[in-house]
């Protein structure tokens, strides 16, 4: 189960596709890959 946008995370693998973990804030955000 992956975390959606703004979901809490500790690393990128916790987030859904096209999302990456913002380690400074501890939530998932867009990682810049849309293709």
Curated annotation (Swiss-Prot):
GO cellular component terms given for this protein: extracellular region
Any one GO MF annotation of this record: ion channel inhibitor activity
Q: What is the lineage of its organism?
A: Eukaryota, Metazoa, Ecdysozoa, Arthropoda, Chelicerata
Kindly give the InterPro entries that the UniProt entry links to this protein. Huwentoxin-1
Q: What is known of its domains?
A: The presence of a 'disulfide through disulfide knot' structurally defines this protein as a knottin.
Superkingdom of the source species: Eukaryota
Primary localization class, coarse: secreted
Recorded protein name is: U1-theraphotoxin-Hhn1a
């Amino acid at each position: 189960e992956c975390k959606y946008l703004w979901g809490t995370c500790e690393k990128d693998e916790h987030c859904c596709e096209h999302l990456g973990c913002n380690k400074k804030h501890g939530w998932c955000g867009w990682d810049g890959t849309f293709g």
